[in-house]
Amino acid sequence: MPRAPRCRAVRALLRGRYREVLPLATFLRRLGPPGRLLVRRGDPAAFRALVAQCLVCVPWGARPPPAAPCFRQVSCLKELVARVVQRLCERGARNVLAFGFALLDGARGGPPVAFTTSVRSYLPNTVTETLRGSGAWGLLLRRVGDDVLTHLLARCALYLLVAPSCAYQVCGPPLYDLCAPASLPLPAPGLPGLPGLPGLGAGAGASADLRPTRQAQNSGARRRRGSPGSGVPLAKRPRRSVASEPERGAHRSFPRAQQPPVSEAPAVTPAVAASPAASWEGGPPGTRPTTPAWHPYPGPQGVPHDPAHPETKRFLYCSGGRERLRPSFLLSALPPTLSGARKLVETIFLGSAPQKPGAARRMRRLPARYWRMRPLFQELLGNHARCPYRALLRTHCPLRAMAAKEGSGNQAHRGVGICPLERPVAAPQEQTDSTRLVQLLRQHSSPWQVYAFLRACLCWLVPTGLWGSRHNQRRFLRNVKKFISLGKHAKLSLQELTWKMKVRDCTWLHGNPGACCVPAAEHRRREEILARFLVLVDGHIYVVKLLRSFFYVTETTFQKNRLFFYRKSVWSQLQSIGIRQLFNSVHLRELSEAEVRRHREARPALLTSRLRFLPKPSGLRPIVNMDYIMGARTFHRDKKVQHLTSQLKTLFSVLNYERARRPSLLGASMLGMDDIHRAWRTFVLRIRAQNPAPQLYFVKVDVTGAYDALPQDRLVEVIANVIRPQESTYCVRHYAVVQRTARGHVRKAFKRHVSTFADLQPYMRQFVERLQETSLLRDAVVIEQSSSLNEAGSSLFHLFLRLVHNHVVRIGGKSYIQCQGVPQGSILSTLLCSLCYGDMERRLFPGIEQDGVLLRLVDDFLLVTPHLTQAQAFLRTLVKGVPEYGCRANLQKTAVNFPVEDGALGSAAPLQLPAHCLFPWCGLLLDTRTLEVSCDYSSYAHTSIRASLTFSQGAKPGRNMRRKLLAVLRLKCCALFLDLQVNGIHTVYMNVYKIFLLQAYRFHACVLQLPFNQPVRKNPSFFLRVIADTASCCYSLLKARNAGLSLGAKGASGLFPSEAARWLCLHAFLLKLAHHSGTYRCLLGALQAAKAHLSRQLPRGTLAALEAAADPSLTADFKTILD
């Protein structure tokens, strides 16, 4: 029998998801009588390969196989498979074998599948079809019989290995739906030792545990007499679940699964399952790194189902121009009475939806614990009814012009002073919209002002008894301050929100007020109730609703993910100006009521874009969201939206397929840094081969309003030439890829593969083999979801026409049709623009790359040519404009390195740079003489690294910080900057040093974001290990980018030895961390000693070159970074 592929990573992935993973022969050997042979002499090679490559996976909780199986065949293979598929469809089970099959219904009739009575096939399933017609599977049926094969197909999961390292799933629940069992934690390999830093061997730096502060450790010791890390003492009786405590008459608001004992701590922490031996990195004292104890519940509309994390995305982009609380706001909808307090308690803690006025309500008994809470929550409702929200808003977030009249700038910053009749200051009539726009853009409230407003509201609203103590109030307000200072994609973890909150101070949590001894289960119950109250007040019910009611919160184009808070009265004026400017630049036609009605009734449904604006330094950028259906108040989760979005993704995949098959369609378009590197390297080597090297002329052109200016008729002609709707038919396969990362995490990706009948791979084995040959697919499991073998080009082209000609934009309650350009919020926008400009280049600039190079990143052109007349003609053509393609140069962003005659381009002239300079283009700096490339860091000036860098802190923030830093480092180590055939050694030294210096800024930003006030001095070895891993990772990427070159040798010699990379890394981190010596004093000594040790190892010439690359004058851009 042939040997099975090893596929170690795939086998390890499956073992982490199933109870048992066995070869097919081993599994069957356990069922059959001794001596029964599955593979016999003379069996076909296909059957031998099937037995060798098939893995049987037994799910957790699967029904056991028949006790005495009958190895007799009764049915043919097609009949047996059909019978299994019908049973799966009747059970409603998700099984790969039944993908593409469904039960017949009245609306969707048709003949049933052969050998079934009520199953139809609506999409081809190539895995099932291959199995039904396979001779090898037929022979397997004859050897094992109906009972055993039915059990394998219906109750187990089968995988077939595909050499060299992948597999695909044949049957069973799809692998991407399975979660790892809690009893089998995924192993995480330790951090390897790295030479170069003293005291950072495998033992010193391998632990990434950010230990708790001494104060928290001492408080934990005071809480319990046992050892700090031990579990709760075993109870004499089996501990009851939370649902079985005395309040069992109420709904189970916090159901708990059976879990091992967890340690009890004085801080509020979610009770979660954790292995006593499992360690975590960066967590607070006394917490565990898994999910909260409660499960999602069917709560009311105003309260989210999963209150685990307050997230900043919940208060972004809230429309509306009035600064007021909506009547549907939960606290406003309830009267300040005991009955209203009861409803509020039920809504917060028991997941009950508030009843509409007049609706019949079935009263139920409220548990005693919650009954005693009513007076406090009645006081809260009364405080809310009396709270002067508008006055507090005017006091703490005054409009800047009005605040300047009443007090100093410091008072305005602190939120001092009252503006009783506050209105945004109107600009004089003679001021233009642009001037007024800039003034209004500056009238955003600082996070401190917003926090002062929220603090005043919370102090007015929440009774003292609910806080329990001033300590708890200060802790919660500190978390509110941190919450509004987070970036766009950040969230505040439940552990942070409840850290150091004292349960014993909150008497309203007590189930039995007279009890002097609190059992561990009761203490955890109190923790959960307080945690739920804090999460809902901070993240869902109150703080987020206040922000949504009084502010428009958005990110900007110039401050990365940092959030800006505009009062709605200011934002409404900004939005009005933005809409007027949009009408001036984009051709929109308003729809009549009849047209709107026709679009709503159209079949298939049409997407409608919602417009929002993104602030720029001196303007607004329109952004559209295409996740809406015309006439339906539904978001992207709606089935209609999902179907239309799926069609758009299919169209996108088809266009990409044609682009890959015919690269000339894109012209000079570059799809990323890798494409730029390949094109630039080819050009550089060609120029350097000439002797003497010619003088080169550079032209950079940015197109004005590229997406909005594309003529739709021309775009339709271009796409018709790409798709060829009357000729083309495509085969589209939807599949999922599941892989296991080096750290034990499972990564899932859902993809589409497009082909034609000429290059179709109909069988999954061939398809997986092709993926491994043509892509970087390794150590993965592939699951086919569906396959369409007849995607007509005409239907895809018709979808494209609907997208272009029927794009509806909702602006201010009215609907408009976009008559020019393409929607910017679509996944197709960039590709359509590139295809259109590629067609323009073929028509207008043939042969322009004969001696030079033309590059374009979407709408940013770069021409480098040795011919001055060619450069002038190219510049003149784009400045004059190409109306057939809507292409016109923006002279403010156009630059050349040669003189332009006065009047040659009209009244305006582009930026003229010296003949020899660092020429900027798309974040790159190109040396016009040597053609070496470095990165342009000017975009980081006056920005906050903290605002642009967020990492999922989760249960292991230390490990997540390290993973995030290394992931960003890999992105920045582009081949264009590290290629020694393009750049000289000094330029590569300088590029590597700047990468390390920016990484040091990121390191500092991450340390500032670590939760629980974790000081660096508590675990310096971990942070030193992160710095050492930074140098190691960058040097590995440097070697990969220069494969075939010998970079280093013994004795720190060679072109670029590893010691040089570590020296640059240490120098960069010392430069940054020395400015924060109070935080990093424990690291500076080790870093300085390691740098001195490397300085003694490096040759003098290499050391002098490194010091020149690290000259402070070369890193002036970094001095203006805000962090």
Swiss-Prot record:
<feature type="region of interest" description="QFP motif">
    <location>
        <begin position="360"/>
        <end position="510"/>
    </location>
</feature>
<dbReference type="GO" id="GO:0007004">
    <property type="term" value="P:telomere maintenance via telomerase"/>
</dbReference>
<feature type="region of interest" description="RNA-interacting domain 1">
    <location>
        <begin position="1"/>
        <end position="230"/>
    </location>
</feature>
<feature type="site" description="Required for nucleotide incorporation and primer extension rate">
    <location>
        <position position="858"/>
    </location>
</feature>
<feature type="region of interest" description="GQ motif">
    <location>
        <begin position="58"/>
        <end position="197"/>
    </location>
</feature>
<feature type="modified residue" description="Phosphoserine; by DYRK2">
    <location>
        <position position="446"/>
    </location>
</feature>
<keyword id="KW-0158">Chromosome</keyword>
<dbReference type="GO" id="GO:0005697">
    <property type="term" value="C:telomerase holoenzyme complex"/>
</dbReference>
<dbReference type="GO" id="GO:0000781">
    <property type="term" value="C:chromosome, telomeric region"/>
</dbReference>
<dbReference type="Pfam" id="PF21399">
    <property type="entry name" value="TERT_C"/>
</dbReference>
<feature type="compositionally biased region" description="Low complexity">
    <location>
        <begin position="260"/>
        <end position="279"/>
    </location>
</feature>
<keyword id="KW-0963">Cytoplasm</keyword>
<comment type="function">
    <text>Telomerase is a ribonucleoprotein enzyme essential for the replication of chromosome termini in most eukaryotes. Active in progenitor and cancer cells. Inactive, or very low activity, in normal somatic cells. Catalytic component of the teleromerase holoenzyme complex whose main activity is the elongation of telomeres by acting as a reverse transcriptase that adds simple sequence repeats to chromosome ends by copying a template sequence within the RNA component of the enzyme.</text>
</comment>
<keyword id="KW-0687">Ribonucleoprotein</keyword>
<dbReference type="GO" id="GO:0046872">
    <property type="term" value="F:metal ion binding"/>
</dbReference>
<dbReference type="GO" id="GO:0003720">
    <property type="term" value="F:telomerase activity"/>
</dbReference>
<feature type="short sequence motif" description="Bipartite nuclear localization signal">
    <location>
        <begin position="222"/>
        <end position="240"/>
    </location>
</feature>
<dbReference type="GO" id="GO:0005730">
    <property type="term" value="C:nucleolus"/>
</dbReference>
<protein>
    <recommendedName>
        <fullName>Telomerase reverse transcriptase</fullName>
        <ecNumber>2.7.7.49</ecNumber>
    </recommendedName>
</protein>
<dbReference type="GO" id="GO:0016605">
    <property type="term" value="C:PML body"/>
</dbReference>
<keyword id="KW-0695">RNA-directed DNA polymerase</keyword>
<dbReference type="GO" id="GO:0042162">
    <property type="term" value="F:telomeric DNA binding"/>
</dbReference>
<feature type="region of interest" description="Primer grip sequence">
    <location>
        <begin position="921"/>
        <end position="925"/>
    </location>
</feature>
<keyword id="KW-0539">Nucleus</keyword>
<dbReference type="GO" id="GO:0000333">
    <property type="term" value="C:telomerase catalytic core complex"/>
</dbReference>
<keyword id="KW-0779">Telomere</keyword>
<keyword id="KW-0597">Phosphoprotein</keyword>
<dbReference type="GO" id="GO:0005737">
    <property type="term" value="C:cytoplasm"/>
</dbReference>
<keyword id="KW-0548">Nucleotidyltransferase</keyword>
<feature type="region of interest" description="Required for oligomerization">
    <location>
        <begin position="905"/>
        <end position="919"/>
    </location>
</feature>
<dbReference type="InterPro" id="IPR003545">
    <property type="entry name" value="Telomerase_RT"/>
</dbReference>
<keyword id="KW-0238">DNA-binding</keyword>
<keyword id="KW-0479">Metal-binding</keyword>
<feature type="binding site">
    <location>
        <position position="859"/>
    </location>
    <ligand>
        <name>Mg(2+)</name>
    </ligand>
</feature>
<feature type="region of interest" description="CTE">
    <location>
        <begin position="927"/>
        <end position="1123"/>
    </location>
</feature>
<keyword id="KW-0808">Transferase</keyword>
<dbReference type="InterPro" id="IPR043502">
    <property type="entry name" value="DNA/RNA_pol_sf"/>
</dbReference>
<feature type="region of interest" description="Linker">
    <location>
        <begin position="231"/>
        <end position="308"/>
    </location>
</feature>
<feature type="modified residue" description="Phosphotyrosine; by SRC-type Tyr-kinases">
    <location>
        <position position="697"/>
    </location>
</feature>
<dbReference type="InterPro" id="IPR021891">
    <property type="entry name" value="Telomerase_RBD"/>
</dbReference>
<dbReference type="Pfam" id="PF12009">
    <property type="entry name" value="Telomerase_RBD"/>
</dbReference>
<comment type="similarity">
    <text>Belongs to the reverse transcriptase family. Telomerase subfamily.</text>
</comment>
